[in-house]
Design a protein with these regions (language model features):
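Aromatic-rich carbohydrate-binding modules that target alpha-glucans
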Residues: 1-11, 17-40, 93-142, 150-173, ...
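Residues at beta-strand starts and edge strands
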Residues: 10-12, 83-87, 100, 128-130, ...
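S-adenosyl-L-methionine-dependent DNA methyltransferase catalytic core
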Residues: 40-41, 819
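Long, highly charged low-complexity segments
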Residues: 44-48
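Intrinsically disordered, low-complexity linker/tail regions enriched in polar/charged residues
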Residues: 51, 58-61, 65-113, 124, ...
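Catalytic cores of glycan-processing enzymes that make or break glycosidic bonds
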Residues: 58-81, 88, 135, 169-853
Length: 853
């Protein structure tokens, strides 16, 4: 390859791929590209000896979480000087913190004559790749050398690499030739890196400056606390805008209207400027104290008040800000999503609905029409520009928090929701990417016995594949501007998604998409004669009283019709679906109405098979049917036959098929950025998931009360894989203290078997018990142990919340959960809680999660 190089030299990045007939058949791992520094000498020739790069086993060390924060080298060395006859030696050594560097030592004077204190430091200009250019004219061949871990300040060797001497025969270089030897790896006897962190939603943060909700300014204060306690990661929930109706139901952080825009409530209004109107400023100061004094977030009051402030500060400062060069850069970089989002938000409020299908105008997205609305001379522009202004400030504030975190060696870990709202900017502007006639959810699990119905549309992966998953690539790349690690919510959705028909409320009537449905002949091959009755709800006199109690007669009269078979009933035509039943009971929230409604949902889902959504005369066994009445109506032979096909269908049939589906998407998506990737792999997990995550070096999630081994009631912390995130509880679960009080018998077993205590378990989780559980988790094998703030505070009787019920963030079985949990103390108080902070520091240090190297 011949290149024209400027006199000052240049840098090139490159990687390798294999092509056949101009078609790429294989690419090497290139998330961290090779970098070559070229001399400005026009006569220069380079001989390059590279090795094909597969994905590194220790991929996490190459992530921006490590290279930009945890093991960052902020003061990079200069590009190594060039020689007329050069030998460039490169090596990867990512597990070296800023106090150390890689050095080279060898069998001659130019390399220190094997004296480690005379080793030659290498350049970290392309960290975590180290390199040095030696003057080959001063070298004697054959050359022998080794790499050394070298302390920069003390200027002495710390340890030699774990390898035999490296050997290089005479390359017979001529003047103006340079040999580049790369893709070497240096390994040292350094303990594996482990860290601890905290998980807390941004809305839950509380400082003395908060406005009734946590904001991006509060993130800096949380970073300060993390640093003071030697925690390395702050994990948050999604922060995208979820504004639909401006009601508390918008508090659900996973139902965003944009995958790019941030929720306006996260703006720190103090950073946006001070109102010149002193009476208005005084009013907001008073409101701030009122809202911040509440034990939980008042979503509606917070957002209403902040929006009043946004309008006033925009009127005062907007014109100047929008004319600034910094805003111009932001706008040009984000125009593609910012304009549709701003217009969508404006029209949502103007037409008083987020359902764009109901808008009298612009219900079908037209880019040219939107462009006209966004022109400064448009009558709509002032309303639209307000959203530009808010998003610009949110961007500045989060970028500042990210920079602050990196400077202090802390990783901000974001959250990528698996779904989007069907009433969102993306559904409006790019409907071809989604299946809007279905609902995404999850099959039954420990979180919800009826499964979960998230209401999101599912993805049209066939369309996404055609453009190389551009939609996802842009999403990940945008996220990498703010985060160095992220959690893939429901990573199973990249293998298959649980799709629920629009007429269903619960998740039980769903089916996996994509999947391989069963024909009637295949069902019968298991010994179960197929009958049409298996497709309709089984409703029999014998169990109606069990379901409805004193309401049985009312249910028969109002919702059921007798069938020809004595004792058997069908649903009336107007109540054949769960949505029809839901509509009938809309607004009726008394105990009896909910009892009857939920009982009818149970009847409607009592089918043995669910028809496939695409292939006629193909079926799926209904998930979890063994607990329901239609299964009990089968004889023993039929039950055994059904269980055989059920086991084959759900646990074996799709393993290779789903693996192929995931490997189409996940490799290029997870490698599109250098963020550290963590997968939420809970629930009904196919066997193929762990192997794919292992192949792609994705961190798993490990929770002791949700073990991956179905034969265990609790997970064994010492068996957790190193490449994992360990936690006690997630936002979808009760906290440690809450769980302790939920099921006394289970708690007793945990107390005796996992904690190894004799006798009767305490009825509440004492600070001492909580500290023991926390310590055990910190001692696990996992690279990261990230605990919720509530679980960290549980170890101290003085600082834990007196009311354990206030600590729960979400109840997945409740589709109308109010996401409003806030810290019961301020971040300023937390910083001053010396005994608690000392205890956390000691726990982290004692368990090896405060590495010095």
């Amino acid at each position: 390859v011949e290149l024209e190089v400027p006199k000052e030299g240049m840098t090139i990045n490159y990687s390798y791929q294999i092509e056949q007939n101009q078609i790429i058949i294989r690419k090497e791992w290139d998330s961290f590209p090779r970098r070559l520094f070229l001399s400005g000498n026009s006569k220069k020739k380079y001989q390059i000896k590279d090795c094909w790069k597969n994905i590194p086993e220790q991929l996490y060390y190459y992530s921006s979480a490590f290279t930009e924060a945890l093991l960052a080298h902020p003061d990079r060395a200069e590009i190594p000087p060039c020689h007329r006859k050069g030998l460039v030696i490169k090596a990867y050594a990512p597990r070296i913190n800023k106090d150390y560097c890689l050095a080279i030592c060898g069998n001659q004077k130019a390399l220190g004559n094997w004296d480690p204190d005379k080793a030659i430091p290498m350049s970290d200009a392309n960290f975590p790749e180290w390199q040095i250019e030696l003057d080959a004219s001063k070298l004697k061949f054959p050359l022998e050398y080794k790499f050394i871990l070298y302390h920069k300040e003390e200027k002495k060797a710390d340890c030699w690499e774990n390898n035999p001497n490296r050997y290089l025969a005479d390359p017979e270089l001529k003047t103006n030739e340079t040999l580049v030897i790369s893709d070497r790896y240096a390994y040292f006897d350094i303990p594996v890196w482990k860290g601890a962190g905290i998980a807390i939603p941004v809305f839950s943060l509380k400082s003395e400056n908060s406005f009734g909700v946590g904001d991006f300014g509060d993130l800096k204060r949380m970073i300060d606390w993390a640093v003071s306690t030697q925690q390395k990661v702050i994990q948050i929930l999604p922060i995208n805008d979820t504004t639909m109706t401006h009601a508390w139901t918008d508090s659900y952080p996973y139902n965003s209207i944009s995958i790019y825009a941030f929720h306006p409530m996260y703006a720190d209004i103090k950073q946006m400027g001070t109102l010149k109107d002193k009476s208005a400023a005084a009013k907001f100061n008073k409101k701030q104290k009122e809202l911040n004094g509440l034990p939980a977030m008042d979503y509606e009051a917070v957002n209403q008040t902040k929006w009043e402030y946004f309008r006033l500060i925009f009127k005062q400062e907007g014109e100047k800000v929008l004319a600034s060069g910094e805003f111009g850069e932001f706008f040009n970089a984000n125009k593609e999503w910012l304009q549709p989002y701003a217009v969508f938000s404006y029209l949502r409020d103007a037409f008083q609905t987020p359902n764009f299908r109901e808008w009298p105008r612009h219900s079908v997205y037209n880019a040219q029409d939107i462009e006209k609305m966004c022109r400064p001379e448009s009558v709509d522009y002032p309303h639209i520009a307000l959203y530009y202004y808010i998003q610009f400030h949110l961007h500045l504030q989060l970028v500042a928090a990210t920079k602050y975190a990196r400077e202090h060696g802390v990783v901000l870990k974001g959250d990528i929701p698996i779904g989007i709202s069907r009433n969102s900017v993306e559904a409006w502007t790019e409907p071809y990417y989604f299946n809007l006639n279905g609902q995404a959810g999850a099959p039954p699990d420990d979180f919800s016995v009826n499964g979960q119905n998230w209401g999101f549309p599912t993805y049209n992966w066939d369309v996404m594949e055609k453009d190389g998953y551009r939609w996802w690539m842009k999403r990940f790349q945008k996220m990498s501007e703010y985060f160095d690690a992220y959690r893939i919510d429901h990573i199973l959705g990249f293998f298959r998604i649980w799709e629920i028909p629009m007429h269903a409320v619960h998740g039980l009537l769903g089916q996996f998409i994509p999947s391989i449905p069963m024909s009637r002949e295949e069902i019968e091959s298991y010994g179960l004669p197929f009958r049409e009755e298996y497709l309709i709800p089984y409703i029999h006199e014998s169990f109606l009283g069990q379901v409805f109690g004193p309401h049985t007669d009312y249910v028969k009269q109002t919702f059921l019709l007798p069938a020809e078979t004595p004792g058997v009933y069908h649903m009336k035509p107007e109540f054949t679906t769960q949505r029809e039943v839901e509509s009938f009971f809309a607004g009726k929230n008394d105990e009896n109405s909910l009892w009857i409604r939920d009982g009818l949902y149970t009847l409607i889902s009592d089918v043995l098979f669910v028809p496939d959504t695409k292939e006629k005369d193909k079926y799926h066994p209904r998930i979890g049917i063994q607990r329901d009445f239609i299964f009990r109506s089968l004889n023993e032979q039929e039950q055994n036959a059904f269980n055989r096909l059920y086991d084959q269908y759900y646990y074996h049939r799709h393993n290779e098929f789903w693996r192929q589906q995931a490997m189409k998407k996940l490799p290029q998506l997870t490698q599109s950025t250098r963020m550290l990737v963590c997968g939420e792999d809970l629930g009904m997990i196919p066997d193929c998931v762990s192997s794919v995550m292992n192949d792609l070096r994705i961190l798993s999630l490990e929770i002791q009360r949700m073990p991956k081994n179905p034969m265990h009631e609790f997970g064994y912390l010492n068996e957790y894989p190193y490449r994992s995130v360990c936690t006690i509880s997630t936002h979808d679960m009760s906290t440690l203290r809450g769980w302790w009080e939920e099921d006394y018998l289970q708690t007793q077993r945990y107390y005796n078997t996992m904690l190894g205590h004799y006798g009767t378990a305490p009825t509440v989780a004492t600070p001492e018990l909580c500290e023991e559980v926390v310590r055990n988790h910190l001692k696990s094998n996992s690279i990261l142990c990230i605990l919720s703030l509530q679980d960290w505070l549980s170890i101290d009787g003085k600082w834990r919340n007196p009311n354990v019920q206030e600590e729960r963030i979400n109840v997945p079985s409740n589709p109308r959960n109010y996401w409003r949990y806030r810290m019961h103390l301020t971040l300023e108080q937390l910083m001053k809680a010396e005994e608690l902070n000392d205890k956390i520091r000691e726990l982290i240090k004692y368990t090896g999660r405060a590495p010095k190297k």
